[in-house]
Amino acid sequence: PFDRSINPYRGCEHGCSYCFARPTHAYLGLSPGLDFETRLIARPEAPAVLARELRSKRYRVATLAIGTNTDPYQPLERDRGIMRACLEVLREHRHPVAIVTKGTLIERDIDILSEMAAMGLARVGVSVTTLDADLSRRMEPRVPAPKRRLATIRRLAEAGIETRIMVSPVVPALTDPELEAILAAGAEAGAAAASWIMLRLPLEVAPLWKAWLEEHYPGRAGRVMARLREMHGGAEYSAQWHRRMRGEGQYAQLIAQRFDKAARRLGLDRTLGPLRSDLFRVPARAGDQLSLF
């Protein structure tokens, strides 16, 4: 868990049918459905705001998470470059960062990330939900194909960047049969560790997800939702931390056991240590008064 994060964008072009962040668009008076995917908000001021925060005398260093809400490497980043500018600020200050993404555009920033990783300042998590390209196209319509994301894991790992494969989300009765195969593919690509999160359906996500499920997989819809209710005490979602992320009950325990067994066998059960915070610095700027002591 992280106590601080930034998001260079609100909304996400990836259009994942299951995205738990969709309700955040409702706070802006926009729909969590199509608006979330098409009416995007870029934050070009983010790098300057970040630099100002890091220069504050009140600031205390801790790993900064990027991508915990919306993907910083969605297609819009290719033209805007806000994420890269944020990384440049973090590199200049030698500040630790952990990134979560499905976007292969992160390869563009390997030059910065490899330099930071060599100092123990950067780590990446790449989410692979399924290895089935057809299912991925339906469920994550504008996300790079699973094989392409695995290639990104390989390139990051080869550059010395500690990378975790994230099976996120696990969809009951739809993607759960692939759990071991996804982990094996991640290990083969060079992932250093692995994690998983169960499908979450907060607020407006639930009706959007159910509509998608009925359209694309009507024969499995009842079973998918029954499994979710089984894990959440009869409800489709629980906001309690542990139940929200992993669920409870026999099925949730089975998924956890399968994951743990496969991760151990593949060497992905490592606990990654903390990133370094002792290298943090505030670079001098033109006009700063230099200390004589």
Q: What kind of feature is each model-predicted range?
A:
Residues P1-R10, H14-G125, T129-R137, P146-E158:
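Conserved Radical SAM active-site core
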Residues L64-A65, V100, T163-V167, S195-I197:
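Short beta-strand segments at enzyme active-site cores
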Residues V89-H95, A151-T163, M231-G234, R258-D269:
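A structural motif corresponding to the C-terminal end of an alpha-helix
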Residues G103-E107, V171-E180:
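Active-site glycine- and acidic-residue-rich loops that bind
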Residues S114-M116, R142, A184:
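Short, solvent-exposed amphipathic alpha-helical segments in soluble enzyme
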Residues A117-L121, E162, E188-A192:
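Glycine-enriched alpha-helix->loop->beta-strand junction motifs that scaffold or abut catalytic
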Residues L131-A133, E140-R142, R155-D176, M198-L201, ...:
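Conserved strand-turn element in the central/C-terminal portion of the radical SAM core barrel
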Residues P177-F293:
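Auxiliary Fe-S-binding modules of radical SAM enzymes
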